[in-house]
Design a protein with these regions (language model features):
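Glycine-anchored, exposed beta-strand/edge motif detector
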Residues: 2-142
Length: 142
């Protein structure tokens, strides 16, 4: 099991030229955290928050993207959401590994997903050691 950790002072950047999403954060969000759209608090002004695979609130596992900037509550969060987006953040990932939503983190071990938590694939590591966005919300629990 290896949870993705962003090196200190890392400034992730996209190696692809796809559009990025941007929306107001409803809570603090860190770089490379999976996010979901919270429209229950204020349906007229939905915000993004850190996703979670906990089955108690299914909507929190409906991942829409991976944060590429830090955001405080009320500030803008920029995120990658297009399948195939390549994020280089200066970390060392294992080529070929798949990455999953485990609680509110990104982890490369499917076995780390707790029984009855939602199964969400977030991406994989390409041959250059970069994170590639490939979000698949399976809509089922483990």
């Amino acid at each position: 099991m290896a949870t993705i950790t962003v090196p200190v002072n890392s400034k992730p950047f996209l190696k692809t030229l796809n559009a990025l999403g941007g929306r107001k954060a409803g809570a603090a969000i860190d770089i490379l955290e999976p996010i979901y759209l919270d429209s229950t608090t204020d349906p007229a002004d939905p915000v993004v928050k850190v996703a979670d695979s906990d089955p108690a609130v299914a909507a929190t596992s409906d991942v829409i993207g991976i944060a590429v900037t830090k955001a405080e509550t009320g500030s803008q969060c920029v995120y990658a959401y297009t399948t195939g987006d390549v994020i280089d953040f200066g970390g060392s990932l294992t080529v070929g590994d798949n990455y999953w939503l485990v609680g509110s983190t990104i982890d490369n071990a499917y076995s780390s997903i707790t029984a009855l938590d939602y199964v969400v694939k977030l991406g994989y590591c390409n041959e250059d050691g970069d994170f590639v966005v490939n979000i698949i919300v399976q809509g089922e629990v483990k």
